[in-house]
Amino acid sequence: MKIRKILCLLLLCGLALAGRAADSRPNILLCIADDASWRHFGANGDKVCRTPNFDRVAWEGVNFRHAFCSSPSCTPSRGALLTGQDFWRLEDGANLWSRWPNKFAVYPDLLAKAGYHVGLKGKGWGPGDFKQGGREHNPAGPAYKDFAMFLKTVPPVKPFCFWFGSQDPHRPYERGAGVKSGHRIEEVTVPPFLPDTKAVRSDILDYYFEIERFDRDVGEMLKLLEQTGQLDNTLVVVTSDNGFPFPRGKATCYDAGTRMPLAIRWPPRIKGGRVVDDFVSLTDLAPTFLEAAGLRPLPEMTGRSVLPLLTSGKSGQVEAARDKVFFGRERHANVRAGNVGYPIRAIRTSQFLYLRNFEPNRWPAGDPPLYGDVDEHLSIDGSPSKQAVVEHGDKADVKRLFAFAFAKRPAEELYDLGQDPWQMTNVATESRYTETKAKLHAELDRYMIETKDQRASGKGAEFDRYYYVTGDGAGKPVEAAPRNRAKP
């Protein structure tokens, strides 16, 4: 009898220790917006867009000032985040509307194997087809109706990993929603690459309205975690996949397309109230989540865990080596003959943005007259802002803005951010920047070779031959792919 009691006691102690061990690993909540740029959040300086919940995560945790997506397009950006790899390493997954290559490990699967309860609400990886590779559910996790329903399914001794993929602020918008919500047209600051008209200002407010709705959803999830006593043991991350859906934003490699909001909160390990200036990529999130869960990041991950930055207690530049970031794009939409892409690779530092356009003879926003279409399926989403550029592109004050959005670009672009924060004056051919351009060119070459980018080995045409997934979910050769499809 005594032996039985001792065995039972040991078993109970073991279960308790196992429960504590599981509880000691953080829950992981990723909240990702759909087409939101860095500068349009309160904690990042926007005085009009109301984002109290993003701001809370930033103020109670760490706000990253220089976070960038791997590619300014939904599918490759999300694939890079999930795998912790640069988008150009993902084969088909480097393009929008692609097939998911199941050979690539994703952090939700790795955490599930390590005992995490994993779930997804909303937009995960995509748009594209993950079933052809043999997956039963989205690479971001099994789908749930909402976060509250998911929490009810989490076993008491298991940590969870949840991906909340909002579809805000993706277009189309309800016109006038921003004004109806209480914003005033006069409050808006229009970027200098867009016409400053009433229609554009209202369009920006409609975009703000959807960011605010995303922020409210984040707030509801934080509230649920507080009510269940799980908030402080949850690593909360709020970010976006790519920039805002306006001309010279989404699908471009300028800051409006690539610079992302990123706030991370985890009180037991992260000292709050800090702003970090280190350059980080969304590819860094997967290795960060794995390391926080006590797992070793995979060797093939090109992203680097930001956990050392988070736990350093420091603000400003924490690691001197994190002084640059790399990104780019391939095919975003079916807007060119043969459905070819517009390949770019880029390096961004605190002082400069250097872009290499591999096919400068192609039209960056689509072949004429296709680029001018005002629907929601193109390289530049249809909008009142796009209309303002297209319909008035022959007017003296809009011609330059039209060129920024639609004209062909040279093989190299270089922007001096100290003089030109909006990246509107290309200085690549100016002699005083010759040394700088050569240095950035060499650094980009080195990184592309190091990460086995097909563009560095002369095999870049492969990106144009990958399958293009149509609206019915069927993968078809690029030549057969129709232009119109469901909302990306």
Give the positions of each predicted feature.
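Formylglycine-dependent sulfatase
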Residues: 2-6, 10-15, 19-412, 421-442, ...
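C-terminal subdomain of alpha/beta-hydrolase-fold enzymes, centered on the catalytic histidine
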Residues: 415
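C-terminal helical cap and adjacent loop that interface with cofactors, partners, or active-site loops
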Residues: 418
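A glycine-rich phosphate-binding loop feature that marks nucleotide/adenosyl-phosphate handling sites
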Residues: 460-464
